[in-house]
Amino acid sequence: VSLVVSMSAFAQAIKVEIVKKEDGGYQLLRDSEPYIIRGAGVDGADLEELTSYGANSIRTWSIDGGVYPAAEILDKAHSLGMTVSLGLDFARERLGFDYNDKEAVAKQFEEAKANVLKYKDHPALLTWFIGNELNFDFTDPAVYDAVNDVAKMIKEIDPNHPVTTTIAGFDKKAMKAIQDRAPALDFISFQLYADVVNLPKYIKNFPYTGPYMITEWGAVGHWEVYNTKWGAPVETTSSEKASNYAKSYLQAIQSQSSQVIGNYVFLWGQKQERTSTWYGMFLKSGERTEAVDVMQYIWTGQWPDNRTPRVSAIGLDGKVAFDDVYLFTDETYSAMLNVADPDQDKVTFRWEIRKESTATEVGGDREYEPPVIEGLIEDPSSQEVTFQAPSEAGAYRLFAYVLDGNGNAAHANFPFFVK
């Protein structure tokens, strides 16, 4: 019989606090020392690999709703010298929860309290995140009364860890509700993608003068790009994504260090959200993309010894995705992808065609990935491919992947419509 006991059962909490500096800015302290978060949002990621790239902190979205339970994540993080901003899942109004239902709100409060009591003394704990993007499609500001009640409770039983909630975008209505109804929060957390470069302007104009984190940032969001005439979002390539990571960090985080007390890049892992490559920094098969190179440089000042391939957009019979390309059933077409490998590695290619996702979920809710349609591409391992348009009319997407044999990859895709 083996007995597994979480560190939180006997460990000593490490005090974390936010202090105001002489210059008017803010500083996160851990154990009385300045703590610079080099963070990533994870769900099921290899934390040892993450630390090897220079990260020192992770954030989660729930206690036990992810791949690994909180106790396991905290213990693993602690063994690696990492910290965890722990998510307390909160029900969302857009999914049917009523924040005027006192019984349901009280039940949620007690669940949060039980989790706080369970994990508050874990040495890897850094901050508490109450809910995620509770402002998404919200109409009832009472949600922030519930957030405040939990924040007050946490401060009473756990004075060692600051408390926040995360906001999708820069939402003035949510900001007003938080200021009016949730004064117990220690800081606010924002989650923006392409628009993150405008966050300093939004903060200044609102105005908000307190400390904040940016707890999701990275790729350009699927709602922020050009849509084809049939409504398919045009995804950036892995190289374009990497450039956006660098730009976002420089303009929204590094330049705003007086108010930004930390950040968590999204997503150290992979997920299906409109496509399987849109937000993850890894492919489903595990290969690293160029965004990982950028994050290692941001975290350590050093590029990896072996870099990822770089790609440009797919060309389909001389056209690009912004051309709203229509194909005819069963007709033959060609596509190609230009690639450059910084290390002159021998690269291999993989192409596939899938139906366009019909997902309409918002806020990161789970989505179904359409399967690969086999037999349409003549030689899916070539740099330039010939393929047959599907025999069924509708929206599709052509995907291309480039692998360098060293665990690195690049990707691009091209939406098209068959008629």
Residue ranges and their predicted role:
Residues 388-393, 406:
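Short, surface-exposed loop/turn segments at beta-strand-coil junctions that are enriched for proline
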Residues 412-418:
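C-terminal edge beta-strand
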Residues 1-6:
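Bacterial N-terminal signal peptides
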Residues 22, 30-31, 37, 204-366, ...:
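Substrate-binding clefts and catalytic carboxylate motifs of secreted carbohydrate-active enzymes
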Residues 7-11:
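Sec/Tat signal peptide C-region and signal peptidase I cleavage site
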Residues 22-23, 29-185, 208, 361, ...:
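Active-site mouth of glycoside hydrolases
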Residues 144-249:
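Noncatalytic carbohydrate-binding groove/subsite architecture in carbohydrate-active enzymes
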